[in-house]
Amino acid sequence: DSKNASFCFGQTMVICRLVVGKYPKYRDVIPQNNSNVLKINRSLLLNTVRRVSVCANKASNHIKFDLQSGSLEISAQDLGFSIAAYEKMQCQYDGEPLTIGFKSPFIIEILSNMNCGEIVMKFLDSKRAALILPAEEEEESGKICGIIMPIMIS
């Protein structure tokens, strides 16, 4: 019928309901002209975020990235339990010094689903979405990209 689509794969059948309307212009939400660029090993960043996020507040999962030329410091704290974690690592960073916050599960999710050695994170400022790409596909027209909204940090 005209309201559903079906797909058969061997003995499996998937039936989907068709949505009426115009598909959103998803390319319009991909940040463009980001002047601050971080290049780092994906697994190093992923493992560091996992370690540091253990000390993040369980309700908010906030972590903070402090970016300077040649270094990235990731930190998290839970004032209720008086715990904190800080890890500093070397990286390639081209841009102004920047402090930006993220929810750690979202960073972990994006990095876990990329199959590459190095990633590039592009930022405009601490209030706008960041773009995460495999370093091999640095062009925004690549096959995969992650977009993550920052959080307000104090």
Where are these regions (language model features)?
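DNA polymerase processivity clamps
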Residues: 1-19, 34-154
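Glycine-rich, pocket-lining loop/helix-strand segments that form or immediately flank
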Residues: 22
